[in-house]
Amino acid sequence: MISEDLKLSLYAEGCDIKQNEFLKYYTSFRIGGPVPYILFPKTLNAFVNALSQLVKRDIPFRIIGQGTNLIISDEPLKFVVLSTKYLNKMNFEEKNNMDLIVEAQSGVSLSALSFLLSEDGYSGLEFACGIPGSVGGGVYMNAGAYGGEMKDVVLETTVYDLRDGKVKTLNKGDLEFGYRTSILQEGSFILLSTKFLLKKDELKRIKSKLIDFSTRRWEKQPIDLPSAGSIFKRPKPDFFVGTTIENLGLKGFSIGEAQISTKHAGFIINKGNATFKDVISLIEYVKRIVKDKYNVDLQVEPEIWK
């Protein structure tokens, strides 16, 4: 799939390479089979070069950040994975003594960025203080919590266009944000970095939000157990999926080692050795029960790789 010459070229341009790695070691669900190669570009230039080389050779690939919103087959996978692990640089620009523009590369931890900015008195990303994952994944899916979403603070995003091999800038309107969606999910663009606009606020008020959001997350979500986060998108504003699943008596229900969380029924956890089949079977079971009872079609929120 990747020739020795290409390996040497990628390495020379700043990519570490690992072979036959199991993706379960790179995901929060702890499920995922082996891939032929994982590439770890150390700079954005190395990332762009790797993308260009793979596209030119028609080598299939996927991008992984912190692996927190993925459900991956445990069978051998036939694509290359590019990790944004080392793409964690940030730049800061103050505006008018009140606003701050932050440019963060795609691999920056979203929760770490939230805390960093909050500690300096900048408001806007408090909602992300407990969201696992990277900036790239957060913008890709317009992640949100507690009334906030990525679209509220994004100014623009730098992307690599797979169609013509050019680096481009997309503004907020170009990104076509929706509920847990963006134009990035259509597959033509790979996110490189994003600029955010934050507002100065009282530190006391910011810290109060952080404490509130963090406490609620710890109390209500199984964040200490392997999962892929919320399994289903909310189909409409007044339809609460976790509450619905709980009311159907499914809290704690298991198939194999995959279990509907006893803490929050909107999550499926890995009790230890769950398989991809266990998880998918449980998802399909819940979807069928909800459809039969409420005539609502649930959509899965995490990406599924197979």
Curated annotation (Swiss-Prot):
Belongs to the MurB family. Residues 30-216 form the FAD-binding PCMH-type domain. It is found in: Cytoplasm. The keyword rRNA processing does not apply. It comes from Petrotoga mobilis (strain DSM 10674 / SJ95). Keywords: Cell cycle, Cell division, Cell shape, Cell wall biogenesis/degradation, Cytoplasm, FAD, Flavoprotein, NADP, Oxidoreductase, Peptidoglycan synthesis. This is UDP-N-acetylenolpyruvoylglucosamine reductase. It is an enzyme of class 1 (oxidoreductase). GO terms for cellular component: cytosol. Cell wall formation. The active site is at R180, S230 (proton donor), E301. Pfam families: FAD_binding_4, MurB_C. Its cofactor is FAD. Its EC number is 1.3.1.98. It comes from the Bacteria. It catalyses: UDP-N-acetyl-alpha-D-muramate + NADP(+) = UDP-N-acetyl-3-O-(1-carboxyvinyl)-alpha-D-glucosamine + NADPH + H(+). Pathway: Cell wall biogenesis; peptidoglycan biosynthesis. GO terms for biological process: cell division; cell wall organization; peptidoglycan biosynthetic process; regulation of cell shape. NCBIfam families: murB, PRK13905.1. The gene is murB. GO terms for molecular function: FAD binding; UDP-N-acetylmuramate dehydrogenase activity. The keyword Cell division applies.
